[in-house]
């Protein structure tokens, strides 16, 4: 090591020179220029990889998250959103800097909250890479697209998780979906309708905004995953560039995550569809955005039809035509 360090320093100094000067000093100018160009490229490290998972509430997101968390070397953060108006609102949050800041005597704006979130995530991402693991972030998309902040014809006036992360990371993202009628019925049952008007049409309109925002992102259907879990996990691992999917179903029972409110039991299997109340059935006649949403995601809008047409995995959803 004693002799290697001076030689390394000499090489670094040599490659730090201007390519033209370096070429003049070496017998092979082309090689010298190539070395200098390689050094210049190496001085700009590539953005680290970060995986992200996006879905609406009551679409099987926790099942997907638990399955991914069961993979070896995965560290999963469940339901993250630094701007969420939901959840614990008390002043006592000794471990949560964002909650402390919002409950403090001079609450900061979105820009500061974003920097707090990004700094904490950067530390955790770096530690995960150092340990040889893969960090997966489960976005709480419901907080963005299904709260009163999202009123109006466009997107909410706040950054999305994608916008918060894409400058610092090479994002590998996946959107997961479920039949919109089934997820809407579950949302009603959980009393999680946090927007106005609280109608199926408004829900579908917001769903379109979500899909528009994550256009070109691969989509996996909940129904496809529950029908063929091993094939679905192989697809997830391909999209997110994760390894070691074998045996994930046996390991996922040990995972405990937030958002685990709808599904009971540990087996991955399709569940019976809920009955459609008369009030919701009446809404189906006046919800054109719902019909377009079903067509966009490859579902039959008829509540008497099959929940899933049988296609294994859907590609990116085309923009809403309505």
Where does each model-flagged region fall?
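PAPS-dependent sulfotransferase catalytic domain
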Residues: 134, 139-247
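A broad structural signal for alpha-helix termini and local helix breaks/kinks
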Residues: 72, 240-241, 297
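A structural signal for well-ordered alpha-helical scaffolds and beta->alpha junctions
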Residues: 61, 110-118, 157-158, 200-204, ...
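C-terminal non-catalytic accessory extensions
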Residues: 305-322
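A short, aromatic/hydrophobic, helix- or strand-capping loop or linear motif
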Residues: 79, 247-250
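PAPS-dependent sulfotransferase catalytic core
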Residues: 1-130, 138-140, 249-307, ...
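Short, surface-exposed amphipathic charged segments that create phosphate/polyanion-binding patches used
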Residues: 91-97, 234-235, 261-268
């Amino acid at each position: 090591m004693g002799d290697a360090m001076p030689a390394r320093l000499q090489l670094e100094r040599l490659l730090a020179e201007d390519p033209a000067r370096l070429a003049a000093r070496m017998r092979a100018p082309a090689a010298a220029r190539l070395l200098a160009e390689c050094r210049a490229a190496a001085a700009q490290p590539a953005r680290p990889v970060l995986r992200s998972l996006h879905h609406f509430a009551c679409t099987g997101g926790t099942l997907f998250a638990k399955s991914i968390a069961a993979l070896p070397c995965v560290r999963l953060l469940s339901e993250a959103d630094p701007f969420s108006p939901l959840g614990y609102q008390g002043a006592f949050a000794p471990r949560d800097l964002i909650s402390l800041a919002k409950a403090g005597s001079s609450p900061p704006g979105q820009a500061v909250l974003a920097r707090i979130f990004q700094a904490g995530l950067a530390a955790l991402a770096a530690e995960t890479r150092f340990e040889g693991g893969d960090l997966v972030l489960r976005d709480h998309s419901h907080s963005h697209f299904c709260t009163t902040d999202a009123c109006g014809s466009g997107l909410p006036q706040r950054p999305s998780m994608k916008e918060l992360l894409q400058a610092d990371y090479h994002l590998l993202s996946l959107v997961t979906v479920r039949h919109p009628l089934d997820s809407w019925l579950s949302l009603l049952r959980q009393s999680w309708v946090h927007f106005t008007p609280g109608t199926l049409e408004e829900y579908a309109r917001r769903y379109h905004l979500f899909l528009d925002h994550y256009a070109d992102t691969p989509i996996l259907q909940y129904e496809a995953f529950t029908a063929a879990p091993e094939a679905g996990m192989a697809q997830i691992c391909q999209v997110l560039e994760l390894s070691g999917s074998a045996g994930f179903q046996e390991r996922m029972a040990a995972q405990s995550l937030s958002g685990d409110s709808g599904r009971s039991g540990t087996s991955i299997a399709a569940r019976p569809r809920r009955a459609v109340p008369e009030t919701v059935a009446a809404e189906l006649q006046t919800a054109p955005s719902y019909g377009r949403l079903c067509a966009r995601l490859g579902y039959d809008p008829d509540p008497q039809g099959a929940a899933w047409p049988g296609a294994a995995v859907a590609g990116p959803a085309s923009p809403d035509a309505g």
